[in-house]
Regions:
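Cytosolic-side transmembrane-helix boundaries in multi-pass membrane proteins
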Residues: 338, 357-358, 365, 415-418, ...
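Transmembrane helix-bundle core of multi-pass membrane transporters
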Residues: 335-403, 430-433, 500, 530-534
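Pore- or pathway-lining transmembrane helices of multi-pass membrane proteins that form conduits
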Residues: 274-278, 328-351, 390, 459-472, ...
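Helix-loop-helix "hairpin" substructures at the membrane interface of multi-pass membrane proteins
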Residues: 378-455, 484
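Extended repeat-based scaffolds of very large eukaryotic assembly and lipid-transport proteins
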Residues: 10-238
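Transmembrane alpha-helical segments in multi-pass inner-membrane proteins
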Residues: 302-303, 307, 432-447, 451-513
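Single transmembrane alpha-helix segments in multi-pass membrane proteins
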Residues: 241-286, 319, 323-334, 473-476
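Alpha-helical transmembrane segments within multi-pass membrane transporters and channels
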Residues: 296-342, 349, 484-489, 520
């Protein structure tokens, strides 16, 4: 009596070991049967065995035929018992043979793993299992999926399970009423993969005959498909709108500093893109310091990088204005050539210090991931934050220009330079501060762009032309015009891309702006200033 439980446990372990050994069968049909038998056991030990088989980590030892899970460490293969998961030694590559699987067997293993993980205490595993079972609907999974659905309490996982169960019930082996009810269930899921599933019911062969024989099922599927496609078109427009606003926010960040230097001061600063680049490299340096000295605070690195990038690029802008620009006011060609040469110098300087290759700038944890909405719409967190950041920068700049003494003096110099000087305003200092402000804002743009683009010496070149287009289109010297221009060009670009492609779309936008400024030379929102008066 005392020994009987021990004998029972030994017998169970022995039978499980025999079932694992059955995976060594030569035929794939026999292997598939062994996988199904293991899945029926439903014990915790089964999942790592099937995962090892799927990932190519299940081997047999040549001298005794024992099945083992193998982990490679350098040139040594560590051996683990598949049932107990204990290390039993090591071997060379010549002493073991991998268990082979084909695509059909992989599908069976994934389906079996899906059934095993449906009842897992881990919500992420249950969610993943429901997704796998939807991709590979099998009548064998219907009962366990229905049981899992009854006990599931998480709303999102219940929705996934209901979708997977409806996909199984849609199969031709079910009664017509069950299939029609499954279509009604699937109609609520406005997703491309559901559309593909229903579209398969309406496929015709070469003779014109439908794959789906029942006319009622086809009619219901057609109505559900039309409803899903109309909603998907709407969601597609909304997603394009988001990407247009995202591109517009990037253009706004890159152009808003140029709107100050070019729009307000009338200075053609071809080195503006390099001020953006300096901000991006400042972000890289800050993150490297955090990684080295304060790895636990990496999530705060961008918060530190924003004011530092503003200071670095702003100081560089002040040096440029005092050293070069102030001697070239009223000479636009010389200013353009001087700043273009400066941009080449800054690029080469960065190549010398940091090297010509791209530098890695990481994203903090709160900017990683995305909002997954219905209809397959995915809104990345980093782009959402950049949209909010660009609007915040615009509002702060507007407040500075309208409600501070510096802003009042800057507007006075812009509207009537000689009168402002006569009133005691030091116009030279205002020029210096204004140019520094514009370059500092460009540096903050570099912080944001480092989360989207490669940080390299050529980073700024990709945005300088677009920035000038935004400023000219929106209206020289008007920040609201820059905002409207950036968002308009971002939306136009994204709505043109599906039809004309990215490159041809930009060409169309450029032609549109050229034609537009023939009609309105001062842009959408005209503003009088030094550049206009001259």
């Amino acid at each position: 009596i005392i020994m009987s439980p021990i004998s029972s446990v030994a017998q169970d372990t022995l039978s499980l070991t025999e079932m694992v050994t059955a995976l060594t069968a030569k035929g794939f049909d026999e292997k598939a049967a062994a996988v199904e038998a293991l899945a029926e056991v439903g014990e915790d030990q089964i999942e790592p065995i099937l995962e090892a088989l799927l990932e190519g980590r299940l081997y047999t030892r040549k001298n005794d035929g024992k099945v083992l899970i193998v982990e490679k460490r350098d040139k040594i293969y560590l051996l683990f018992d598949p049932v107990e998961l204990t290390e039993v030694g090591h071997a060379s590559k010549k002493e073991i043979t991998k268990l082979r699987v084909n695509n059909r067997l992989r599908r069976i293993i994934r389906s079996a793993l899906g059934r095993l993980t449906l009842l897992s205490p881990d919500p992420a595993k249950r969610m993943e299992a429901a997704g796998v079972l939807f991709q590979k609907p099998s009548p064998a999974n219907a009962s366990i999926l229905a049981a899992a659905l009854e006990r599931e309490t998480d709303t999102a996982i219940r929705s996934k399970m209901a979708k997977a169960l409806a996909a199984i019930q849609l199969g031709p082996q079910n009664p017509v009423e069950t299939r029609i009810a499954a279509i009604a269930e699937l109609k609520a899921f406005v997703e491309p993969e559901v559309r593909s599933l229903l579209s398969a019911l309406l496929i015709q062969d070469d003779s014109g005959a439908f794959r789906e024989q029942d006319a009622n099922v086809r009619a219901v599927a057609k109505r559900a498909l039309e409803s899903i496609e109309s909603k998907l078109r709407l969601y597609g427009i909304l997603e394009t709108l988001f990407h247009g606003l995202s591109l517009g926010s990037v253009l706004l960040l890159a152009a808003i500093g140029l709107a100050i230097t070019f729009g307000v001061m009338g200075v053609i600063n071809m080195a503006h893109g390099e001020m953006v680049m300096l901000g991006a490299y400042t972000t890289f340096i800050v993150q490297e310091l955090f990684r080295t000295y304060l790895p636990g605070g990496f999530d705060y690195s961008l918060m530190v990088a924003i004011p530092l990038a503003f200071a670095v690029s702003g100081f560089a802008g002040i040096c440029v204005e005092r050293g070069i620009i102030r001697y070239l006011y009223g000479r636009p060609l010389e200013t353009l050539l001087a700043t273009w040469g400066l941009s080449l110098i800054l690029q080469q300087l960065v190549r010398t210090v940091f090297g010509p290759t791209n530098r890695e700038v990481g994203s903090p944890s709160w900017m990683m991931g995305a909002v997954d909405l219905t209809g397959g719409i995915v809104l990345p967190y980093n782009r959402i934050y950049i949209i909010l950041f660009s609007i915040t920068v615009l509002i702060v700049l507007l407040a500075v220009l309208r409600h501070t003494t510096f802003g009042l003096r800057m507007r006075a110099v812009t509207q009537n330079r000689s009168m402002a000087g006569a009133m005691g305003i030091r116009t030279g200092r205002i020029d210096m501060s204004t140019f520094g402000l514009g370059c500092g804002v460009a540096g903050m743009a570099g912080v944001a762009l480092s989360q989207l683009d490669n940080v390299s010496p050529n980073l700024g070149q990709a945005y300088i032309i677009d920035s000038f287009m935004v400023v000219v289109f929106g209206g020289v010297g008007n920040l609201w015009g820059t905002f409207v221009g950036a968002m308009s060009l971002g939306l136009i670009n994204k709505f043109l891309e599906p039809y004309a492609g990215a490159v041809l779309g930009k060409i169309f936008v450029l032609v549109f702006i050229i034609l537009f400024i023939q009609k309105r030379p001062r842009g959408l929102f005209a503003l009088k200033g030094r550049a206009v008066e001259s």
